[in-house]
Every structure is written in structure tokens, then in C-alpha cells.
Amino acid sequence: TLDVENTVTHRGGKLHLDPFEADNKLVMVGCLTDGNEETLFRDTFDGVQEILDEATVLIGHNIVHDLLWLWECGFKYDGAVFDTMLVEYVLQCGNKQPLSLEACANRYELATKKQDTMKEYFKNKVPIDEIPKQELADYLTADLKATQELSDVLYKKLNTKEYSGLMNTVLLTNRVAVTLARIYQNGFTVDVAKLNEVRDEFEKEKAETEKRLTKQVTKLMGDTPINLNSPEQMSWVIYSRKPRDKVEWANTFSPYMDTKEYKKQVKEKSDIVYKTDAQQCAGCLGGGQVRKVRKNGVPFINTNRCDACNGSGYHFVPSTLVAGLKFSAPTAKWISANGFTVNKTNLLTLQGIARKNELHDAVSFLTDLQRLSALDTYLSSFVEGIITHTKPDGKLHVRLLQHRTATGRFSGADPNMQNMPRGGTFPVKKVFVSRWDGGKVLEADFAQLEFRVSAYLSQDGVAIEEVTTGFDVHSYTSKVITDAGQPTSRQDAKAHTFAPLYGATGFGRTKAEAEYYTHFTEKYQGIKSWHGRLAKEVISTGKITTPSGRQFVFPDVRRNAFGKVSHFTQIKNYPVQSFATADIVPLILIQIENELSILKSCIVNSVHDSIVIDVHPDEIQKVIHVIKIVNSSMIRLIETEFNIKFNVPLLLESKIGDNWLDTKDVI
């Protein structure tokens, strides 16, 4: 069992705990053998390598952090690992609970608890290397013992009848952890000058979008001041209603409220919003400030906010015209604390309704509102996130996590690149380049992975036939919608092709688009039947088991009076997403890393279903050959790993270029 203590850097409003910060350093390393022989290295680290050489398994809680520090400090370890954090995550079967060492120690009532002695030091931002060494050593010792005790508990749990089926998932998850640590260590080179250009483009577009929205809001709301960044005020604009009493409003609705009762309560608990006319406040003459006078008639030097107009300078007098877009939120699930939700999913639904009814102003407004939200995210999460986390070596060290999502699909941090829009047009991708002059960036992307996995899991004959013959499903989607009366390009049709797999319906779509959603379930009867079997399985057993052995529990599942099963979207999604992106993608990631181990080229990221490689200029054809080898052996590898017969073709499509965006197909 191993744990490290290191200094941290405060930069850009963030804590940086990694070894890539110039001022960060290793302070202490602790090791505990299975014979409870403890060794702490404080001032010198001689002997650490000897322990690593003798280790058969390295146990840690968040082992990636420990591996990075060991590797960056020159130590070598390429053996097996057992990450207690990841093992506990797998054992939770999608029913997520806190995974910190402290939380795990308390949950399993370990004899050794994580010590509180350091919390005051951390709270006061005392540098690790300035904490008294004996106190730090005691803290490290407690962590080592707690981690070892936890590993014993988890290993015993894994060998019980209830959880033994998860052993293969645990083994794969730990193997992947080492690969993700290597990706983290490799880093992805950032062209900072290009990043600044992208930021300028986004800021210019944001200003133009805000200008259009402000003009539209004035038309919709009259003179009522509206903050475009306020979800509450956007709710007024979109739904034309305002809660009378927020506390009462929040306590009135439940997600599964009867539709008739829901509509009745909306009318009773909210008021219609009307357009207003601004009239100058007589008290402050439009200035928003007043100067009070003392009893002796002498005015005060400082002014005060005008109470009559609340400092706005105007009174907003309601007219008889209803303000806003006048949409109705269809169910109680759309309720928020301040009115109604304005999240991306619901705005897309409303946009579909507006398009269906040819409400052009509403379509324009909702399109711009979503774009403004996207631009804010691009600037804060991506541009600023990349700037903050790009290290002195000029690289963004991509941190991929296996324990954040319910399904095991990778999530990202610092920043989360998994939120990157799909497709080959996102400008931020152009800032990522090769570390070598003349080097290239190659992206290997699984073709229709989740659809193909759905075809396999359901054994839908139509889907399997289409995949096997290379049938162009996007062109087919385009044809269905076009034939229904709405000309649609293949590119635009892509947004609809697989949406029904994830629970999307024809609600809020145009009539022609809705036709495709109906057509999907009729066409893929095998997938529809499989969804029904999954629901019955969960009602009967409370859980789903995937071909890899990974499990998902649904302790609160129920069937309502109309026969519908709760959590149905998750029941449909989890098996597909987990087997595709938490099992197959990581397995192939490991294989590609093994194939690249004798080359200079290296994996630098994985986003969605893709794997990104920084390619040395002398190894372009070698890396392309690696992807071809992986393609030819992929099915055999999956069948061997999971002991299954996989009868659906899989393919990594690859493209290469001078940066991550500007690429051309090579496979």
C-alpha cells in the first residue's frame, strides 16, 4: 500500500496538486506491506524503487495521483494496481455514494479512520512542507492503514456470491487507471496564440448575440429590465408567468403530479406577466438617487437610493399586453424554484414546438439564447479552463476519471473536455497541436459505437444487417423526414438518427421529425423488445447486468398505475453506454497504448468515443498501421476479455492533421 504527500500550487483560482507545476515537490512517501511493515521516506527517497521492484500489486486510494508523482520523480512501476476508490465505485453499481477515503472509512467502520489533525492546516493553506514532519507522518500512516484495511474489506466483498461477478470489471478498471495515468503524464501541447484568437472570435460572437437578444427582449417584454443571464427572468420571457410566492411555489409541485392538478396549481400560484411602459420616477427624476435633507434643512453630502423606484429611476407600469413567448411548461418536471426551467433540453423541445407552429420569432430567440449559453460555456470552461490548466511545459495534462459518471464512462477535469461538442467544427480543437515540429494529431473515432452496441445487446436483426452491410442510416433518416414533408440534409438528420436510443421522443418536434421517431421503434423492433425485457428484469431483480459483468442497481424502481416503469431512460441507456464507453473504449485504449509503447507517439486524450494520439513526424505510417492492427483484432479482443460472442462489426475511423481540428481521413 502506497501514499504520497506533495505540495500544491494556488494558481488561477485553482488548486494544482500535480507534479507538472514548477513549484510543486514531493515531500513524503509512505509504504505499508501486507505484513504491516511500514516505511516512511521523508528527507530522502532512497529505497522507494527497491520497494516498488518487490511489489506484486500497488494499492492506493486514487492511485493515478500516486503513480504520476512516482513516475515524474524518476521512479519506475509498471505492475498491477488496486485502487480502493475505483473498486468501491464499481461495487456501488451505479448507486453513487461519496468515494473519499474518509467517507469509505466511515461507511465500512474501519478500525483506522482518516485523521482530522491536518484539516486546520489545510483550511489555513499551510504548505505541506511547512507542516511539522511528525504530524504529517502520523497523518500519512493513518491514511496507509485505512487504505490497506479498506482494500481487505473490498477484496473480501468481491469474493462473495453477490459481488463476485464484478471481479473482471474491477480488474479492467484498474488496468485502465494505469493507462489514464500515462495519458495524464503525456500532456497535449497547446498553441496559446491560436487559443487567444479563438477567445477573441467567441467574445465577438457573444457580443453580437447579446445585442440581438436584448433587442428581441425589448420587443417581447416592453420596458421591463431583463438580465439575459438570469434563469428566473428568462423564465418570465419564455413562459410569460411569474410565481406569486416562491416558497409556496417550491412546496406545491412534485415531478409526478397529475397533469390536470399541475395546470390548476400553475394558474393559482402564478401571475401572467405583462409588457410594461417605463415612466420616469418623480422622486428622483430618473436618476435613481435622492439627496435627503437634515432637520435643519441642510442636504446630506451623500445621496441615497430612491425607495420609490428601488433605484431604477423609473416605474414600470403594466400594460394590457401579455409579455414574452407565452409557452406552457407541459409537466411538473419543468418546475424550478423561481418559475420554470430554462435548461438546454427543455429549450430544444420548445424550439421544436415553435418550429412546428412556424413561430419564427420564438425560434430565433431560443436559438440565440442557447447559443449565448454555449458561448459562455466555451469561454469559461474551455478557453479559460485551458489557460488556467496549461502547465509551464506548454501542455494541458488531460485528467480522465472513471468514477464520476453513473455508467463508468470517462469524465474529465481541469477542464472537462468531455463536454466538447461533437462533430468536426469546434474551434477550440485547433489550438491542440503536436509537441514535435512536423508532428501530427491523429483522432481514431469509433463509428456509431453505441448504436452498434445496441444492435449487439438487443440482437436486432435489422440493426445488425445495416451495420454489416454499411447501410447509410443518416441518409435514411434524412429521407424519412424529407418524405414526411420537411426537406432535411444528411448532416441535419444526424441529430435525430440515434436520439430515440437515449429516450428522445417525437414530443416537441415538427410533424415530419416526429414521424421519424415513430418510424424508429417500428423499424428496430428488436431494440424495442429488448428495452421491454430490461424493464421487466429491473422490476423483477432490481438490477441490470451487462456482458462485461458490470451491474446497475435500481432500488427505487416502480411500475405506475398506467404500467410505465420509472427510471426507464436510465434502464435503456446504462447498459449501452457502459458496455460501449466504460468497457469497450477503455479496453481498446489499453491495446493502443501497448502497441505504441515502442514508439515516441503517445495517446494524449480520449473524448466521447474517440482516442487522440500525438504522432511523431517519423512515425505517421506506423501509427496508422497500429490503428489498422487494432481494427483487425478488436472483435477477438472483446470476445476474449468478456467471454462472449460479439457478432456486430466495430470500426475505428481515423483522421490526421496539423492540429486536432484540421484533419483528413486516413482510415
Feature-to-residue mapping (PLM):
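Conserved catalytic palm subdomain of right-hand nucleotidyl-transferase polymerases, strongest
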Residues: T1, H61, V81-M85, S434-E450, ...
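Conserved "right-hand" nucleotidyltransferase catalytic core of DNA-directed polymerases
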Residues: T1-K14, E21-N24, M28-G30, R107, ...
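Active-site-proximal helix-loop-helix substrate-binding element of RNase H-like nuclease domains
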Residues: A22-T160, L172, T477-T482, T488
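Short active-site loop/helix that positions an aromatic residue
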Residues: V64-F75, V87-Q92, M234-P243, A447-V462, ...
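Catalytic palm subdomain of template-directed nucleic-acid polymerases
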Residues: V90-G94, R182-K206, S454, T505-R509, ...
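Polymerase palm active-site segment centered on the conserved acidic dipeptide of motif C
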Residues: Q148, E197-E232, F520-H531, D618-I667
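Conserved catalytic core of nucleic-acid polymerases
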Residues: V178, Q185, Q279-I301, S312-H315, ...
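Function-dense linear segments that define catalytic or interfacial modules
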Residues: R399-Q486
